[in-house]
Amino acid sequence: MVVSQNWIAIDERTWRYEDGGVRFFLLAGAERALLLDSGMTVHNARELARQLTDLPLSLFNTHCDIDHVGSNDEFDEVWVSPMELVHPKAPHDSRRVRPVWDGDVIDLGGRELEAIALPGHTPGSTALLDRASGMLFSGDPIQRDGRIFMFGPMRSLAAYIHSLRRLSLRKAEISSIWPCHATCPVDVDTIDELIAGAEAIERGEASFTVDEVHGNPVRACDGGPSILLCDPA
């Protein structure tokens, strides 16, 4: 079988797929494999994953923005935070939803992944921490050289700051961070740098420019490692 050149091996059990401006991940254990998000432009993520593993395959959504759910319809079951079900792109057939709460552990067989809730970017944004390796698959909330969407009715800067502060308390457990956008991987110090940047935005002290994203006026605020796209003042 020909393996797509978009697949990049991280180690012998972990891969990332570069899908334009977004990426998704494939994690394998001894018994099962897990796809973290399902792409933006691709609609055959299951088939792509089969290029690398024949283990039973499940899908986990870090959140349900449109650039993370491109192949969701390929899967009968989706692991996702119930807090994310308000999202218009979330699976609304309850039979397809396997709820994942903060602190839940997904065991792939000798490889445990802990769900860490990171609300703010979206209500149900959730990262997965590989407990053995310390690799944190962060979704969108943690980025370096990226543009983090914080505008619109479902997003909350205050919740985002709280999530990052909570995550910062666990930095000793994290060896590297693997975001779905921009630079990858990033170092653990990115968490505290984003906290400082977001707090400056909250205080009204961060510089910004006026921009437009998908027809929405936004403030493109200096958030330290990344730009935070916030609602107009």
Q: How should each PLM-predicted stretch be described?
A:
Residues 3-51, 128-139:
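Conserved beta-strand hairpin/beta-sheet module of binuclear metal-dependent hydrolase folds
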Residues 32-34, 58, 111, 134-135, ...:
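Structural motif
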Residues 37-40, 64, 121-122, 134, ...:
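Active-site metal-binding loops of divalent metal-dependent hydrolases
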Residues 40-114, 144, 196-204:
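Active-site HxH/HxHxD metal-binding segment of metal-dependent hydrolases
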Residues 45, 156, 160-167:
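A general structural detector for well-ordered alpha-helical segments in enzyme core domains, enriched
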Residues 113, 122-160:
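A contiguous binding-surface segment within folded domains or other stable secondary-structure elements
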Residues 118:
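Short, contiguous alpha-helical
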Residues 165-233:
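Accessory terminal helices/loops
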